Amino acid sequence: MGDGMNSQSQSEQGFTLIELLVVIAIIAILAAMLLPALSKAKIKAQATHCMNNSRQLMLAWMQYYTDNNDMLVNNYGQPFSALEEQNQTYQSWANNIMGWGANDMFGNRMDRLDGITQAPFYKYASSVAMYRCPADHFVSSKQAGAGITARPRSYSMNGFFGAYRPDVPNPGANNNYPTYRQFLKSGSIPNPAGFFVMCDEHPDSINDGFLQANPHTDVAPSKWDDLPATYHDGACGFAFADGHSEIHKFRSRACTILGVTFGSVNLVPFSQDPVAGTADSLWVAERAGLPLQ
């Protein structure tokens, strides 16, 4: 037989080792170029989903007061919200207390949902997925060991909105900042687009459904009261009383954009980053509360 019967062309022999290494190198370079873009796309998609969730919560919040003679839904702080869940009275918008243990202070599993699903507010926001930011994937090792894959809630309500406790001695004033107004009816909010109602709260800071912000804009506070979350590449989701949502980018990596410790929140004094930290705090303060007239 001729030579053509027992020889192969180069195309039939496949890649040489050098050619294969070149292809692998090109793929690695392309992957390195694409990964940052894919990461940014994921962050943007999660932020969009977060805003959709908070908008739905705001629609529910608005429908609630429409059906209840203009009264805003209750927004109990500790220990009142915990007692609402334990006593099965469920009168706050969210009655569960978040933490890093497998169980809450009463021995109930941390992923129980009745504090949300049995509340009157749930009639208007009847999807448990709505209460969690898609970027909130944090569970502690204890929770993971107990089979808990997600905590129920990422959002908290501005502490200047809704009744703080079942028996409010001075319903017109905030419990923690008594020279500031407590909004109990929607008609008392002078500029709904200027005040936030819901926001992401940092995983180490979140407990009850109540977020306390220092509302003073004339004197810079020493540190955060409750810490907003920065799930979205240093940014936090806020939803306002007129129903709109936005993602706000914070500045301070020393005081505001903090990692998750799966323990008590580490509130860093603004003196550690006086320009950016104070700017972050004042942005929230300007949109949190209103002095009593």
Provide a role label for each language-model segment.
Residues 50-293:
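Short, well-structured segments within or immediately adjacent to enzyme catalytic domains
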Residues 1-4:
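Short, Lys/Arg-enriched N-terminal segments with co-localized hydrophobic residues
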Residues 6-52:
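Amphipathic alpha-helical segments typified by the pilin-like N-terminal helix
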